[in-house]
From Swiss-Prot:
UniProt xrefs under PANTHER family: CHAPERONE PROTEIN DNAJ, DNAJ HOMOLOG 1, MITOCHONDRIAL-RELATED
Organism in which the protein naturally occurs: Chlamydia abortus (strain DSM 27085 / S26/3) (Chlamydophila abortus)
Domain J: 2-67
Location of the protein in the cell: Cytoplasm
UniProt record similarity statement: Belongs to the DnaJ family.
PROSITE patterns for this protein: DNAJ_1 (PS00636), DNAJ_2 (PS50076), ZF_CR (PS51188)
Positions of CXXCXGXG motif repeats: 161-168, 178-185, 200-207, 214-221
Annotated cofactor note: Binds 2 Zn(2+) ions per monomer.
Residues that, per the record, bind Zn(2+) 2: C178, C181, C200, C203
Cofactors demanded by this protein: Zn(2+)
This protein's name: Chaperone protein DnaJ
Entries under InterPro entries matching the protein: DnaJ, DnaJ_C, DnaJ_domain, DnaJ_domain_CS, HSP40/DnaJ_pept-bd, HSP_DnaJ_Cys-rich_dom, HSP_DnaJ_Cys-rich_dom_sf, J_dom_sf
Amino acid sequence: MDYYDVLGVSKTASPEEIKKSYRKLAVKYHPDKNPGDAEAEKRFKEVSEAYEVLSDPQKRESYDRYGKDGPFAGAGGFGGAGMSNMEDALRTFMGAFGGELGGSGSFFEGLFGGLGEAFGMRGDPAGARQGASKKVHITLTFEEAARGVKKELLVSGYKTCETCSGSGASSKQGIKCCDRCKGSGQVVQSRGFFSMASTCPECGGEGRMITDPCSSCRGQGRIKDKRSVHVQIPAGVDSGMRLKMEGYGDAGQNGAPAGDLYVFIDVEAHPVFERRGDDLILELPIGFVDAALGMKKEVPTLLKEGACRLTVPEGIQSGTILKIKNQGFPNVHGRGRGDLLVRVSVETPQNLSEEQKELLRKFAATEKAENFPKKRSFLDKIKGFFSDLTV
């Protein structure tokens, strides 16, 4: 049996071409699509055996040089007496589709009606599991968010057991390969028309058995822990932002990496400033006399000097925004600062005395149309509707 002929590819075929051809043939001859068909079962085992060799660079090189009896073949050649064990053939099948069997709309869901998990794709077959990621929320003052700050967080979780270095055993001799699943962490069972892969009940999917557990972690390889973590919050962060600290989550198991720590930011509101992106908005109320005559005004800022001198031009209208450049929030990516936007609010006087009212009446008697251009423009527009209105 020539493995290249079995898969229908040339001897110069790329790994992608070999995998593509195997997938097509494996699906075609899969026992769940051909129940009771002995010939299809035989072909399924053959293409699985061929793929198991040609998908491995070392085995393929040895096969190309020496044939089926190469040094990487093991006793009886690459396939021995052929891949007669359906469990091995199905395991090869699972490996070929391993990256695509999770989530809705996956290959297997379309082909076998959502049985991806039934074919055993439930994580690393060797039992190595990355540690869980953790998340914490931190609240900053407006000023801390503006200048950046270093914070100390207390994080609860799991750390690698120092006694056994994460192995879970008191010594190397205290670990053995699981006899039931042969280290794969899964067992395959035939149920009616389906070949179902499930977590090995003996080892719980670990692929190994601990015969002499570590006394500190009781065979878990991890222990509960509370630790202080220092996190540098960059200047310019805003509510809803998230910082990722790789490797600061729970310790992994069986040599897998630790999870990550996600720090979610909340920024308190400020009594004076409102933030819009990297810009700050300051509401500045002024009297109508200052609005008419203009003025110079000290306005607060978030920078070290604490205040900035602002010129309010005469005749300014309520709602006008005056910009002070580079006095806003720092950009979180280091691209400068925003601006301080001062929104002027002209306040109409209230609770006037009779003397003040009389002065205003005298002022009104001196008003001219050019003193109120918007009013004049409005009256000009409606003059045709109300002929009795005059400027």
